[in-house]
Amino acid sequence: MKKYLFLCIAVVSLALSPGQAYAQRYLPKMMGVELRGGFVNGSKSPLNYYTGIAMSGYTKKANRWVVGAEYLLKNYDYRGTSIPRALFTAEGGYYLKFLSDPTKTFFLSIGGSALAGYETVNWGDKMLHDGSTLLAKDAFIYGGAITLELESYITDRIVLLANVRERVLWGGSLGKFSTQFGLGVKFIIN
C-alpha cells in the first residue's frame, strides 16, 4: 500500500510542478543535414526554382557553420520559348542566431555565405530556335549571399526551415542578383 501511495504522490507532484524540461538544442558540435528548395525571384513561374543539400555544424554560442551545394534554374522568355540559365554552386557560410523563443522551438538566424560555381546558359547551345545566336557564355561564377532563416523544431531530430536569401554572383553573362524564397528540412545526426 505504501508503494502505491508513494507512486501516486510522485505522479501528482510531477504533474503539478511548474518547471518544464526542454530538449537540448543548438548544442556545440551538433551536426545536421539539410535538404532545401524553393522559388527564385518570386513564384511567377514554377520553372524558376532551386534545390540543395547542406551540412550544418553548431558552435559554442549557438551559431552555426553551413557547407553545401545548390542547383538553381531560372528561365528567360524569348519569343514564345524559354532559355534556361542553370547555376551549380558550392556554399560556405556562417549563421548568427539572434532570436529564439523560451521553449527553444523556434530560432531566427541571419547568415552570410561565400559562393562559387558554374553557370550555363541554354545548356551551352548558342543557336536559338529562330536562328539567332546567343551571346551569353558559360562561365565560372563567384560571389556571396545573405540569408534570413527560421528554424522550427518538430522533434529533437527533425527541423523545418523557411528562408529568404539574396545572392549576388559575378563572372556570369546574365544578371548578378537573385532572390530566393524556400523551405527545407534538417535532420540532426548527432
Pin down the residues of each PLM region.
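Cleavable N-terminal export/targeting peptides
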Residues: 1-28, 190
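Short glycine/proline- and aromatic-enriched beta-strand/turn motifs that initiate or cap beta-hairpins
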Residues: 21-74, 186-190
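Extracellular loop and loop/strand-boundary signature of outer-membrane beta-barrel proteins
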Residues: 38-41, 76-83, 130-136, 168-172
